[in-house]
Amino acid sequence: MPLQPFKTSNLLTMGVELELQLISLSNFDLTAASPDILELLGRSSFPGSFTPEITESMLEIATDVHEEYDQLLKQLFHIRDTLVTVGDRLNIGICGGGTHPFQMWSNQRIFNKTRFIEVSELYGYLTKQFTIFGQHIHIGCEDGNQALFLLHSLNRYIPHFIALSASSPFVQSKDTLYNSARLNSVFAFPLSGRAPFVLNWDEFSLGYFEKMEHTGIVKSMKDFYWDLRPKPEFGTIEMRVCDSPLTVERAAALACYMQALCSYLLENKEPLPHEDDYLVYNYNRFQACRFGLDGTLVHPKTYEQILLREDILTTLRRLKPYANQLNSTMALEHIYEITHKGSDASFLREKYAEHRTLESVVNESLKQFRSSK
């Protein structure tokens, strides 16, 4: 089946998807509560959309399409409040975080949906290990060529989003030493990584995608687990590297950071993207996952080594006029605060050092999601 035409969207509109953890309040482990949560949400007036995820201890929510930070944040608060209310009725906690600190993958149950069952049959145990939680950010594009230009221009900024959103230091009761351990699980899938370097939509659709479809490996764009991928049915590019933050404020701020970056890149303020930019892509990605804001990057154009935290601060200065135009100054101030106060991964480690139990770490995550304003 040919790839559908790229839908025209209003430029720089944005939307957010969040994968959230469903927590038993008796032991703070994940709980297979999504069927019950989904049933209750279906009876409520939900201010967005909600869908199951691959295991029953997960829930995905999505916002509407927005142009500005205030609108996006307002809806995320409304979604959060609705989720908390429904969770309270079932005695289920809901929180962010890229991984649950001590859940065992083998205990997870695949949600009864045809696609999820097919994925489970194909990938085996990896499917249950995919009980991880990310934020996806969509940015509207006017056409497919523009989408591919932005997708490849953003490649050097992927480490920013990994480090700023990092919230997955613990896996199966161990400190992984990573700030974002979640992405290691994604990399296990054969169709993960980055998109092929193609800047023309017809070439991507008729050349690359049709060839991949003819191999029998893929049926749709959903089969690609790329860090950034085009979504022709939405008319967007979708960034998939972010851990789910602990608060909806951070989720909104990350979306607006991407929005401002796209506005900046569309003015051709940087050299055009090139295939060789990807020579350092996996190394820079690793640095952000492992060391977070303390990582060191190799600039893809100059091969200069730069501190990740300083690169974010330099970028924030460049984006200031674009944020002013987009009414997202407050969002970028939040990003600035992360560079000084630390990421959610740092917060979770601090709470573990304070309380010495991972159950307490989960409880702190629940408080962050519920009480943020």
Curated annotation (Swiss-Prot):
Keywords noted in UniProt: ATP-binding, Ligase, Nucleotide-binding
One of the protein's GO biological processes: modified amino acid biosynthetic process
EC number assigned by the record: 6.3.2.2
The keyword Ion transport belongs to this UniProt entry's keyword annotation: no
Pfam families: GCS2
Stated family: Belongs to the glutamate--cysteine ligase type 2 family. YbdK subfamily.
Protein name: Putative glutamate--cysteine ligase 2-1
Organism annotation: Legionella pneumophila (strain Paris)
Zinc in keyword set: no
Function: ATP-dependent carboxylate-amine ligase which exhibits weak glutamate--cysteine ligase activity.
EC primary class: ligase
